[in-house]
């Protein structure tokens, strides 16, 4: 240990300037005194042999008015204490005289100068001297000490339980599940045109979409590569049928679309809109039905309860829904009759017309505007909530306190986790982790480590900070494994088992909820910072560790020097080692020590000469001092030792030499002796310092772990935009589903329920029942169609008006028919022959008019022709004959339509008429002879 420095003089550094000024003034004064002094012997050579004591005695002012016998002037030097009368002072000179002469006035001047110098030195010593002196009594052996043996130099612990291995780093899978979906729909376009005299104007255009029925998809589109040109769908709670080109439905071939993308294809039936020409000045409406099939990419994100097509339509059903035990638990928000799963479905390539050789399970789901189909796959092996991020061939795992650190130089990253394993079973949809980790680790081990390392246990899983899942396979080199094997054979396998034992595995708490998913940060900069810090920490700590080890080795080597130095100066070595001032001496291989007593600097007086009275060839090696333990104690003689130590013996002597110069530590500075006589005091600041200390202040870097810190979360980034496309599309498409009952609209026909019930009834009767059922259902559907048509016609306001007009017209016709029948009954001839009857009446009126003129008015009654009964009877026979002829003609006409029996009946009627007599003959215009006038 370093030697303790003596205490500095009291006061600040400006005091040393004052000391220097006083010293300069004293030097000038002494030079003046030297010039004025009488010549005489000076220095040690002129020392009087009669001087018995060379110590500085305290004198009163005015005592030094002359020189002593040797030319020396006793002087109090810095560090001297209060003066005492000195009753034990031996007499100077023979006869016990004082040996002093009374001087002249010049001597008085010199005495005054000396007194002034003494006062200045005392004032400086009282103000600035602060270093204590110590008196170390000789050790008696009651207390002995020994030096410590060399210490073992420990290494700096940079970590423990380092393990190398292979690692696979997994991250959160934010990519959606992607699959191929086929969209089936028919696009209806209704156009209205107005034909002018020379131009055609489009006055209206209506577009709509309708889903393709399941049967048409399976039988026509996938079966034949064709599609029907008509479609029946529901709009405004009514069943609507649209025909392409306003013609009856037919099967049309699907042709590839003109353009396609790498992830989508399309087929259609027509690319023209039907807009018929109308007559000039009239409107005409035309309908176009285009059957479209689109194959595109669909995506579904966790928790996979819906998916979205590439066109932006949302389908609110899980892509993994189906009829199996696990698939039934998947979410499907549509009615059961709108979903169908087809087993043994052979997809057809509509471009080449080839069918797939392997069947698949096909899901079909109809929505209000389209039908979507996709290949069903089980959920468990096809989706994974985590995905492989990095495969690290060299990963080092180190244990730091309560954490593991996985460091990869290839990635320049360090991942931190706790000491407990995190099995992937705690993560939902994580079946891919074990499979992919095993495949990657097996490939790396077979390619790189198969000949040099062995595996230690199985794959271990840890959840690192930042949401990274690490699959770690510990490895052990073959040489180290062989050493462990030998240790095991020697029965020292306890530490080996503890070192190779895998960490504990975390288990879910009892009654824990469903499994969750990990959330991985968007950046890995924190892991890179951790790697950088660990790299710097390792480098710095290794460097400081080497320095500390070298320092320890240096201390052990210096211990040998200490052991040798204690034999030369045991007191100094013991004081430097113990850290306090002690006295010491060697007792064999140990040191006996004694405690040093501190002495105030004010109680120490130094003598100005180092010569031994009576022996001119021998001098003291160190100055002599007088001291008191207390301020009022007796004066004790001693010798100044090293570093302000006062020795009670005065036996440190040496042969006197010429040109003697020495500096001795006295108080807070140095005293300078030249030719074994005091010269002056030197400040410590005036002596350049050569330091032997080597400062070593080492501070190890503390362990620090960087944690991920997100400035903006995913939700904040998502909400930073003005529009959320997914939310806008979702709201727009939910509008129709939210305010309309689509399912009830599609199933509101009571006739359809009746027909479905009849069909199920006849299906249960076997093949014959099915045949009868088809006939009955056909007739029933016809009747229902007629009744539905009549009811629909009557429910139409224009239809009701037309029916009313027809009824009114029927009533008017019945009225006129009834009137005609009444007239026929009253006057058949007039009813049957109105023109003939009118002519006969006109002739009768003319005959009556001419007869009256000839015969006079009185002969008017006689002029009327008498009615002939025979003619009347003949007229009646004529009417009856005409009736029979009319009946015969009707019978013959009906016989031609009805068949043989009717013809026989007509023939019999002819026979009856022929048997009745003569045929009809018209009446002669003249009267027969013999008739009455």
Curated annotation (Swiss-Prot):
Biased composition (Low complexity): 36-49
Disulfide bond sites: 136-596, 153-552, 227-291, 384-432, 619-656
Chain residue ranges for the region called Involved in fusion and/or binding to host membrane: 193-199, 278-285
Complex formation: Homotrimer; disulfide-linked. Binds to heparan sulfate proteoglycans. Interacts with gH/gL heterodimer.
Glycan attachment points: 107, 161, 418, 450, 697, 747
Family: Belongs to the herpesviridae glycoprotein B family.
Protein name in the entry: Envelope glycoprotein B
Signal sequence bounds: 1-36
Organism: Herpesvirus ateles type 1 (strain Lennette)
UniProt function note: Envelope glycoprotein that forms spikes at the surface of virion envelope. Essential for the initial attachment to heparan sulfate moieties of the host cell surface proteoglycans. Involved in fusion of viral and cellular membranes leading to virus entry into the host cell. Following initial binding to its host receptors, membrane fusion is mediated by the fusion machinery composed at least of gB and the heterodimer gH/gL. May be involved in the fusion between the virion envelope and the outer nuclear membrane during virion egress.
Annotated spans, Disordered: 36-115
Keyword field: Disulfide bond, Glycoprotein, Host cell membrane, Host endosome, Host Golgi apparatus, Host membrane, Host-virus interaction, Membrane, Signal, Transmembrane, Transmembrane helix, Viral attachment to host cell, Viral envelope protein, Virion, Virus entry into host cell
Annotated motif Golgi targeting, positions: 881-884
């Amino acid at each position: 240990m370093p030697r303790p420095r003596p205490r500095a003089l009291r006061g600040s550094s400006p005091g040393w300037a004052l000391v220097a000024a006083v010293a300069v003034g004293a030097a000038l004064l002494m030079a003046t005194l030297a010039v004025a002094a009488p010549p005489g012997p000076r220095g040690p050579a002129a020392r009087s042999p009669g001087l018995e004591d060379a110590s500085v005695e305290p004198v009163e002012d005015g005592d030094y008015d002359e020189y002593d016998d040797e030319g020396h002037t006793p002087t109090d030097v810095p560090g001297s204490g209060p003066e005492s009368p000195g009753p034990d002072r031996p007499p100077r000179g023979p006869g016990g005289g004082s040996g002093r002469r009374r001087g002249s006035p010049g001597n008085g001047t010199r005495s005054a100068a000396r007194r002034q110098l003494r006062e200045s030195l005392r004032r400086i010593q009282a103000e600035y001297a602060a270093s204590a002196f110590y008196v170390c009594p000789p050790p008696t052996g009651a207390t002995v000490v020994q030096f410590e043996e060399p210490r073992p130099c420990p290494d700096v612990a940079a970590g423990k339980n380092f393990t190398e291995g292979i690692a696979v780093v997994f991250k959160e899978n934010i990519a959606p599940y992607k699959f191929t979906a086929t969209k089936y729909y028919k696009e209806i376009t209704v156009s209205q045109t107005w034909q002018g005299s020379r131009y055609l104007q489009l006055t209206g255009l209506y577009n709509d979409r309708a889903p393709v029925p399941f049967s048409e998809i399976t039988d026509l589109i996938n079966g034949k590569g064709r599609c029907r040109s008509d479609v029946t769908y529901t709009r405004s709670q009514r069943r609507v049928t649209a025909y392409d080109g306003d013609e009856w439905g037919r099967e049309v071939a699907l042709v590839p679309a003109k353009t396609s993308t790498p992830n989508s294809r399309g087929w259609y039936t027509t690319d023209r809109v039907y807009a018929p020409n109308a007559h000039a000045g009239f409107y005409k409406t035309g309908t176009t039905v285009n059957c479209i099939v689109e194959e595109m990419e669909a995506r579904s994100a966790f928790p996979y309860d819906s998916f979205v097509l590439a066109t932006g339509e949302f389908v609110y059903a899980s892509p993994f829904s189906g009829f199996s035990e696990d698939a039934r638990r998947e979410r499907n928000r549509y009615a059961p009759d709108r979903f169908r799963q087809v087993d043994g479905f052979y997809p057809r390539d509509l471009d080449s017309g080839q069918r797939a050789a392997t069947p698949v399970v096909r899901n079909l789901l109809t929505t209000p505007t389209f039908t979507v189909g996709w290949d069903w796959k089980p959920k468990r092996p096809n989706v994974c909530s985590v995905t492989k991020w990095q495969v690290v061939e060299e990963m080092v795992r180190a244990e730091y306190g309560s954490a593991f650190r996985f460091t990869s130089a290839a990635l320049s990253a360090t991942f931190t986790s706790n000491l407990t394993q995190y099995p992937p079973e705690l993560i939902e949809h994580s079946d891919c982790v074990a499979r992919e980790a095993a495949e990657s680790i097996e490939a790396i081990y077979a390619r790189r480590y198969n000949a040099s390392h062995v595996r230690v246990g199985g794959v271990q899983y840890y959840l690192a900070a930042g949401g990274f899942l690490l699959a770690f396979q510990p490895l052990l080199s073959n040489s180290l494994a062989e050493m462990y094997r030998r240790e095991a054979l020697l029965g020292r396998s306890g530490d080996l088992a503890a070192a190779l034992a895998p960490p504990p595995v975390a288990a879910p708490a009892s009654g824990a909820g469903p499994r969750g998913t990990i959330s991985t940060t968007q950046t890995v900069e924190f892991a890179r910072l951790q790697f950088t810090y660990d790299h710097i920490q390792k480098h710095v700590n290794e460097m400081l560790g080497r320095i500390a080890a070298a320092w320890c080795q240096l201390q052990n080597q210096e211990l040998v020097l200490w052991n040798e130095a204690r034999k030369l100066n045991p007191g100094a070595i013991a004081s430097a080692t113990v850290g306090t001032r002690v006295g010491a001496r060697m007792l064999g291989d140990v040191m006996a020590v004694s405690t040093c007593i501190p002495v105030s600097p004010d109680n120490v007086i130094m003598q100005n000469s180092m010569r031994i009275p009576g022996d001119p060839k021998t001098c003291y090696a160190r100055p002599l001092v007088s001291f008191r333990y207390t301020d009022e104690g007796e004066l004790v003689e001693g010798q100044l030792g090293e570093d302000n130590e006062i020795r009670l013996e005065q036996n440190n002597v040496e042969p006197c030499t010429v040109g003697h110069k020495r500096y001795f530590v006295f108080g807070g500075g140095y005293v300078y002796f030249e030719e074994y006589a005091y010269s002056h005091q030197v400040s410590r600041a005036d002596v350049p310092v050569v330091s032997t200390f080597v400062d070593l202040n080492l501070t190890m870097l503390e362990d620090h772990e960087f944690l991920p810190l997100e400035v903006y979360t995913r939700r904040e980034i998502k909400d930073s935009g003005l529009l959320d496309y997914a939310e806008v599309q979702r709201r727009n498409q939910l509008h129709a589903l939210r305010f309309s009952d689509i399912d009830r609209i599609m199933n509101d026909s009571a006739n359809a329920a009746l027909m479905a019930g009849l069909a199920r009834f006849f299906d249960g009767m076997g093949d014959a029942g099915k045949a009868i059922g088809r006939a009955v259902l056909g007739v029933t559907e016809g009747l229902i169609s007629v009744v539905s048509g009549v009811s629909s016609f009557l429910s139409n306001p224009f239809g009701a008006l037309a029916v009313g007009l027809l009824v009114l017209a029927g009533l008017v016709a019945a009225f006129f028919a009834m009137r005609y029948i009444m007239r026929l009954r009253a006057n058949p001839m007039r009813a049957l022959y109105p023109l003939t009857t009118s002519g006969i009446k006109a002739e009768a009126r003319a005959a009556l008019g001419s007869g009256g003129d000839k015969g006079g008015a009185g002969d008017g009654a006689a002029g009327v022709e008498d009615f002939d009964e025979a003619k009347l009877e003949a007229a009646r026979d004529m009417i009856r004959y005409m009736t029979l002829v009319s009946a015969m003609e009707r019978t013959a006409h009906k016989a031609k339509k009805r068949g043989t029996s009717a013809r026989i009946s007509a023939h019999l009627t002819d026979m009856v008429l022929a048997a009745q007599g003569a045929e009809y003959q018209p009446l002669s215009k003249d009267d027969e002879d013999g008739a009455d006038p």
